[in-house]
Amino acid sequence: MSQQHLKFGIITSENDFCSFVKQFSSLGIIKSTYKLSKEVYFSGCSIESLQRHVTEKDARNGQVLEQDVLIQPWQFADLIYKSVVYSNDYKGVIDLKDNMFLLALVETNEYISFVTSDLIKELHSGFDISLFMYGFGGEQFKYETQFIFFQNLIRELYIIFTISKKYKSVIIPEEIVKQEIGVEWKDLVLVLFGIFIDSLFHQDINEAVRYLTFDSGKNKEEIFKKVTEYYSADYDTIRNSNLGRQIFYVKPYIKTQRNGLLTASVYFNQFIVEHSVFWIIRNYYLNKPKNERQTFTDEFGRLFEHYLEELFISYKVNYEKVPEEKEKRADWHLTIGHYNILIEQKSAVLPINIKQQLTDFKAYKKEVHKTIHKALTQLETTEKDLHIDKPIKIILCYDNYIDANILPHVFEEDFPVVNDGRYFVANIMEIEMFTELASTNFSLFEIVIEDMLRRNTKDNGEGLSLLKIMRDNGYNKDSYWTSPIFDEYKNLLKDIKDRHKFFKDK
């Protein structure tokens, strides 16, 4: 088409997609995905930016092709991965016209649909189908909610560094980061966040080093190299990784066969910053002897509890830490007006093979059984042991990938806890908002509670997301993360951004 005579067709097999992507240089695909990821990112992933119309005239026969395209940036990983696996930098089209790349995305969507249809054949229950669909939606949600990234990053740094010091943690995060990466944690964040900021303007990763400023006496180039080496992957690494397309969420910087170090998607660079320190520490302990592997998971759970307690104190909520017994109970009992609220915190983070549109639903099911089933049992036990009449029972998940709407499907399984319509799943941002609402506007808080109960007992399709329920009732405020307790981390990120030439010139 046009001057680029490429073959497009229906994708009905892996071989079809292999033949298709071989027409393009891997470098050409990486250049095009980066360019389009910038456009979509700056638009806030708006529906207007995702919908395109392609009109292309075939130079050979004069035939005009009309094609509507829905850009799905979460599928860039699939196209890049398959391109690296099946092609290379030296064969195929390098400089793709915009319309050609959009048509390549259409073929990628066809391929994903083909693979999805095969996977769906393995789903044997409504619960399995729900897990598969919520896994699919979880990755998409991450792309569509840029603002949550900053909150998650700042909150997590506060828990790992400030709360760990305050409550004398056995984990010394500064030492672990230095040992694993060879740089101090602030320099790690400085480089990763700096690369993300610079990738909004340049594809070459090495461009970012010009805009980074370290403490006096530090070797800027050496620090930058250590961090980028840790988070980079060449084509052989990508091809041989058992992570598949998920490797770009772990190693987002791509070493091309033409000696470039490139950003493939602005989103990959953003995502790697968000939980970078957490994963360095977690992986450090996973490589320890078996009896030490759980150390960080357990300790992070304790620090997460302290974080929540600070939240309750800040908003003067009447709370009680539920006494521990031999049979495990929930963590917290809140009394807000005439409402009793039980909260069970879960700090587990889902494996990376779950966090994709073609989710490993068997692994997801296993994690749900391990996390949600256990939490439901703890909440029911606490309700009975403490003789609490009709409490609101909330499972607070640190990992916001577990969708609140999954809960009714859990009860559809053969599960001993009876669904009384008072169980909910929430993430930490939602609980911050929920607590603030209870403290500042009790009448609206009551309306939200009643709406929660109504939606949980009537299958009306409105959903059980606490965030959506609050927003639907006119509440959209989370002031807690703007508290001065987070200033050290907010200022660190602000300084990095403000030093970049683009923002300096504003």
Can you describe what each PLM-predicted range is?
Residues 1-174:
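N-terminal nucleotide-handling cores and adjacent loading/scaffold lobes of large enzymes
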Residues 312, 332-334, 341-347:
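Conserved catalytic cores of phosphodiester-cleaving nucleases, focusing on short active-site segments
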Residues 321-335:
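Beta-rich nucleic-acid/ligand-interaction surfaces
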Residues 339-341, 392:
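Structural motif
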